[in-house]
Amino acid sequence: MAVPRRKTSPSRRGMRRSADAISKPTYAEDKDSGELRRPHHLDLKTGMYKGRQVLKAKSES
């Protein structure tokens, strides 16, 4: 069975775990509606994506 040759140092362990951190999702303000939305996602309220109408806008009821 394979065994580690040396003990993993705290520095190396920390560098390995640095990619596991959870970051807050970023938001961009929509130019038309002023609402916050995720970058590279369509705005569900207006149905727009990159200036094009992709979905029908949600009707207010």
Swiss-Prot record:
UniProt keywords, alphabetically: Ribonucleoprotein, Ribosomal protein
Gene Ontology CC terms, in alphabetical order: large ribosomal subunit
Recorded superkingdom: Bacteria
A GO term for molecular function: structural constituent of ribosome
SUPFAM superfamilies: Zn-binding ribosomal proteins
GO terms of biological process kind: translation
Biased composition range(s): Basic and acidic residues: 27-44
InterPro entries the record matches: Ribosomal_bL32, Ribosomal_bL32_bact, Ribosomal_zn-bd
Biased composition regions of type Basic residues, renumbered to the chain: 1-16
Annotated stretches, region: Disordered: 1-61
Membership in a protein family: Belongs to the bacterial ribosomal protein bL32 family.
Name listed for the protein in its UniProt record: Large ribosomal subunit protein bL32
Gene (name only): rpmF
